[in-house]
């Protein structure tokens, strides 16, 4: 059972009770603390010396209900995703991606993640990708897919330290930790790199802001997802004239767009 405590305050909640603490999900000014055990008493004690912080809500939920995921393996393109290294008997050639979602997003089941995996499978199967950049790494599933598909180096960026912690565990479990570097950041402006491949699967406000900023244009091949079909034309406008749309992969109403430099 996960115990989730919602705190409201400014800055970062430091020196929290660490016994049973799985991680912290930041959505400033709210911070969600995930514990494996009942921790209300030590948290209330922590709050006594911090008058600027409030406990605004708490939730108890089964661990497997955080993402409401089921455990059957999924085959997408050249990948097989699940909690087991054994591929399905009828698809023995698939690359296995072992994923424990922990308490962050990115199990491989969301339609946008599926679309990105299909796009990665397609692009890496026809192009040599040396360096890949995954913006919004989550559990690391897309970064791991890039490494397994042949990228020599993958830079995975996320603003959430809990996501990076989980991504690192998953990278190690998949034997690609030596090719994936994890960076805590919320924008691309702090980097000066020219990757062969760039993938971004995030919510629309962040996608729009990132596309407008323009650093993603340093890449040669691009995959974008996380928006509904109503935003598709806006994405295409950001891409032109430097990039052309190679394909649009749709999964349950969620498009994944693949772009290449013209």
Predicted regions: what they are:
Residues 1-90:
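N-terminal auxiliary segments of SAM/dcSAM-dependent transferases
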Residues 54, 77, 93, 152, ...:
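A short helix-to-beta-strand connector/capping loop
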Residues 66-126:
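SAM-dependent Rossmann-like transferase core, predominantly class I methyltransferases
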Residues 95, 131, 196-197:
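Structural motif
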Residues 109-187:
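Conserved SAM/SAH cofactor-binding pocket of Class I
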């Amino acid at each position: 059972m996960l115990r989730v405590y919602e705190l409201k305050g400014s800055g970062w909640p430091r020196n929290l009770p660490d016994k049973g603490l799985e991680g912290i999900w930041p959505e400033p000014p709210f911070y969600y603390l995930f514990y494996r055990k009942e921790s209300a008493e030590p948290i209330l004690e922590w709050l006594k010396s911090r008058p600027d912080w409030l406990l605004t809500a708490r939730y108890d939920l089964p661990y497997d209900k955080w993402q409401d995921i089921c455990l059957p393996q999924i085959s997408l393109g050249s990948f097989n995703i699940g909690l087991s290294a054994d591929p399905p008997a009828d698809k023995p050639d698939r690359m296995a991606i072992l994923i424990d979602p922990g308490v962050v997003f990115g199990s491989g089941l969301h339609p946008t993640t599926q679309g990105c995996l299909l796009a990665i499978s397609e692009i890496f199967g026809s192009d040599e990708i040396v360096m890949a950049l995954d913006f919004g790494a989550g559990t690391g599933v897309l970064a791991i897919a890039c490494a397994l598909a042949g990228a020599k180096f993958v830079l995975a960026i996320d603003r959430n330290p809990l996501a990076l912690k989980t991504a690192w565990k998953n990278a190690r479990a998949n034997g690609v930790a030596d090719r994936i570097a994890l960076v805590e950041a919320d924008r691309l402006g702090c980097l000066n790199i020219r990757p062969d491949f760039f993938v971004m699967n995030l919510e629309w406000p962040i996608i729009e802001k990132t596309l407008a900023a323009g650093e993603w244009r340093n890449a040669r091949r691009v995959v974008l997802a996380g928006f509904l079909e109503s935003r598709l034309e806006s994405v295409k406008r950001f891409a032109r004239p430097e990039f052309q749309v190679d394909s649009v992969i749709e999964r349950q109403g969620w498009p994944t767009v693949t772009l290449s430099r013209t």
